[in-house]
């Protein structure tokens, strides 16, 4: 039986109790307060549910991650980067990026990024936990992604693309910046063919948990807010 979270506690069940099917389902209920969300990510748990349903909390096995030094840049993406087709910024329009990620897509029915999610993660953004990467073509937002940073781990949430290689460009800029800050891991949650093209690999839940304990506790020696970052444009 899946446990319901107490509204009076930020504790979660042990992730080893997560179901095998559906893979990683751990708990229901609770809320999306900044405190609970940070507590969840520190434990390798994330919310994922359809609007109107109870909040569902997940910790899948295996876990899909990208080690920054193993990020794969394809030849076509490298050409795009060298041509300087796009301009990339950080933390310039967080809510707009989330709404773009929430927009309907031809290959998916509906979206799990509700107004409730946007409101909650925007609060995390205001507190310096959640960050966005924006990809611009002229003055048009054509790609981007968002996620959370805790210690030396970035927890990716979602990305979108409205132009060729736009989201991959944003991810490449993010990875390079995280490398400069000595980030050790990018959590991608669950596998997809798209993520594997970026160099993602799968690791066990136990291995992921060990990395969480070590790397989320490392001191933050990078800015709380990223909007003043001026990314290097040469590739």
UniProtKB/Swiss-Prot annotation:
GO terms for cellular component: cytoplasm. Its EC number is 2.3.2.6. SUPFAM superfamilies: Acyl-CoA N-acyltransferases (Nat). One of its GO terms (molecular function) is leucyl-tRNA--protein transferase activity. One of its GO terms (biological process) is protein catabolic process. It is found in: Cytoplasm. The keyword Nucleotide-binding does not apply. Keywords: Acyltransferase, Cytoplasm, Transferase. Disulfide bonds: none annotated. It catalyses: N-terminal L-lysyl-[protein] + L-leucyl-tRNA(Leu) = N-terminal L-leucyl-L-lysyl-[protein] + tRNA(Leu) + H(+); N-terminal L-arginyl-[protein] + L-leucyl-tRNA(Leu) = N-terminal L-leucyl-L-arginyl-[protein] + tRNA(Leu) + H(+); L-phenylalanyl-tRNA(Phe) + an N-terminal L-alpha-aminoacyl-[protein] = an N-terminal L-phenylalanyl-L-alpha-aminoacyl-[protein] + tRNA(Phe). It is an enzyme of class 2 (transferase). NCBIfam families: aat (TIGR00667). Belongs to the L/F-transferase family. Functions in the N-end rule pathway of protein degradation where it conjugates Leu, Phe and, less efficiently, Met from aminoacyl-tRNAs to the N-termini of proteins containing an N-terminal arginine or lysine. PANTHER family: LEUCYL/PHENYLALANYL-TRNA--PROTEIN TRANSFERASE, LEUCYL_PHENYLALANYL-TRNA--PROTEIN TRANSFERASE. This is Leucyl/phenylalanyl-tRNA--protein transferase.
